[in-house]
Amino acid sequence: MSRYRGPRLKKIRRLGALPGLTSKGTRPGSDLRNQFRSGKRSQYRIRLEEKQKLRFHYGLTERQLLRYVHIAGKAKGSTGQVLLQLLEMRLDNILFRLGMAPTIPGARQLVNHRHILVNGRIVDIPSYRCKPRDIITTKDKQRSKVLIQNNMDSSTREELPKHLTLDSFQHKGLVNQIIDSKWVGLKINELLVVEYYSRQT
């Protein structure tokens, strides 16, 4: 299944706020309507919608998300918590959380077009897994700097998560540590996502 490229508002009306997909929010009252509908949903649909929230927020294909679930299942600790850590530490998501890109698809485009360096080297793989002490900078080209600066100027990001530090003047971000689950950028029940996949096998 390919990455979603359809209408974004349609998705957030059904699934709720997906800040990684679009900076636009849901309409007033939509959360109440979703809660009203939730009484009529089957357990399968509830798990499916949580999975879809995760997939669309992080901009993943079905195959990519399934691969992350398998990796998380083999790691120590809670599968759901590890899954969120893996997704949050992707380079495209880190750029988004730093405010260097308006959305995760926007961050992915920056990486694909080779505007971003990690530890002084160009990285053009959006799924690159960032590690503690990684330094993320903009390529030393005027176009790259202007793109990032424009994104940062228009950013509506709230408090920066504790695992990141941003030097906005130098367009530089630092990964301090692996993200703590309470700083994940999406309201999600990750256990339902794990249950969804466990019931597919």
Swiss-Prot record:
The alphabetized list of GO BP terms reads: ribosomal small subunit biogenesis; translation
Q: Known InterPro entries for this protein?
A: Ribosomal_uS4, Ribosomal_uS4_bac-type, Ribosomal_uS4_CS, Ribosomal_uS4_N, S4_RNA-bd, S4_RNA-bd_sf
Q: Has keyword Chloroplast? A: yes
Which keywords annotate this record? Answer: Chloroplast, Plastid, Ribonucleoprotein, Ribosomal protein, RNA-binding, rRNA-binding
Q: Where in the cell is it found?
A: Plastid, Chloroplast
Ranges in coiled-coil conformation: none
> Its domain of life?
Eukaryota
Q: Which GO terms describe its cellular component?
A: chloroplast; small ribosomal subunit
Q: Where is the S4 RNA-binding domain?
A: 89-150
GO terms (molecular function) for this protein are:
rRNA binding; structural constituent of ribosome
For this protein, the record's PROSITE patterns field holds: RIBOSOMAL_S4 (PS00632), S4 (PS50889)
What's its job?
A: One of the primary rRNA binding proteins, it binds directly to 16S rRNA where it nucleates assembly of the body of the 30S subunit. With S5 and S12 plays an important role in translational accuracy.
Q: How does it assemble?
A: Part of the 30S ribosomal subunit. Contacts protein S5. The interaction surface between S4 and S5 is involved in control of translational fidelity.
Q: Which family does it belong to?
A: Belongs to the universal ribosomal protein uS4 family.
Matches recorded under NCBIfam families: PRK05327.1, rpsD_bact
Entry's PANTHER family? 30S 40S RIBOSOMAL PROTEIN, SMALL RIBOSOMAL SUBUNIT PROTEIN US4M
Q: What is this protein called?
A: Small ribosomal subunit protein uS4c
Q: What is the source species?
A: Acorus calamus (Sweet flag)
